[in-house]
């Protein structure tokens, strides 16, 4: 798999039941939040959502990749969810990616390594939206079912950098990640998906590192800030970003080099680079 497309066949979150409405319509007022009970309760809701989405898979012979909450440092929860999936879907648990928002970029990397022509993808995570007081409100668990498929013309992943980060301010990893991207890329970056949300200062540390990309960006570089529109949706965020990257005419008709920055507090920071390729380059 070089160039790829992402097709979302089912999208189910407390905020919207349609991915295009969520991306392109006026932002709806968020529903009333629900009381966060515990991660154990959230895991149970993730299992319920997984059963709902798995039942809608059309071709179960394709590889299936699960994009799941970033539970890197929560081994008990990770093992609980993995064990439940193995009991429910014993033939479809080879690829469980507990990376949250960065999982979708890891998915592309995996698809290239495995030389898949097409694969099923299910993303599940907790979702949050900012209220009128600019505080995150828990909405519940959301999920999406999609496919990733080889394309002759489209976006090709050229790099994927990932680093654990306990604290964005004290342990900022984006400086090193951006420096590596500059070393490995010579093409001008004309589109950046950035993770800031305007609520917590630590979420905008990517801005302080932007100068490291000065040789690759300029005043014409376009920025997408999905957290403002989508809220915090974890593993769903990465999938939605790739769907927008590969399907939006405003993007595919105008941009050639995209950078997708992902991060989750107390978890990780990451960035993936995508280059638009034509059929001639693909061949």
PLM region spans:
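Conserved "HGTGT" condensation-loop signature of ketosynthase/thiolase-family condensing enzymes
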Residues: 1-126, 134-283
């Amino acid at each position: 798999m070089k160039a790829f497309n992402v097709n979302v066949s089912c999208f189910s979150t407390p905020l919207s039941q349609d991915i295009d409405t969520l991306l392109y319509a006026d932002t709806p007022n968020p529903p009333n939040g629900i009381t966060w009970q515990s991660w154990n309760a959230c895991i149970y809701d993730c299992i319920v959502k997984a059963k709902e989405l798995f039942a809608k898979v059309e071709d179960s012979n394709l590889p299936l990749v699960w994009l799941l909450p970033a539970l890197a440092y929560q081994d008990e929860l990770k093992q609980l969810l993995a064990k439940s999936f193995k009991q429910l879907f014993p033939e479809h648990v080879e690829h469980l990616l507990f990376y949250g928002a960065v999982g979708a970029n890891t998915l592309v990397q995996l698809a290239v390594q495995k030389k898949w022509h097409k694969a099923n993808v299910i993303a599940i995570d907790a979702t949050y939206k900012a209220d009128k007081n600019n505080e995150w409100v828990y909405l519940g668990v959301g999920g999406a079912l999609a496919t990733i498929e080889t394309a002759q013309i489209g976006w090709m992943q050229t790099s994927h950098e990932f680093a654990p980060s306990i604290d964005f301010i004290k342990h900022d990893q984006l400086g090193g990640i951006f420096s590596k991207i500059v070393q490995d890329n010579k093409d001008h970056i004309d589109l950046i998906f950035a993770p800031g949300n305007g609520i917590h200062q630590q979420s905008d540390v990517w801005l302080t590192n932007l100068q490291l990309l000065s040789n690759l960006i300029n005043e014409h570089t376009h920025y997408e800030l999905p957290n403002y529109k989508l809220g915090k949706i974890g593993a769903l965020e990465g999938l939605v970003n790739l769907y927008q990257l590969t399907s939006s005419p405003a993007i595919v008709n105008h941009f050639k080099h995209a950078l997708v920055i992902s991060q989750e507090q107390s978890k990780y920071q990451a960035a993936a680079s995508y280059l638009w390729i034509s059929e001639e380059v693909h061949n």
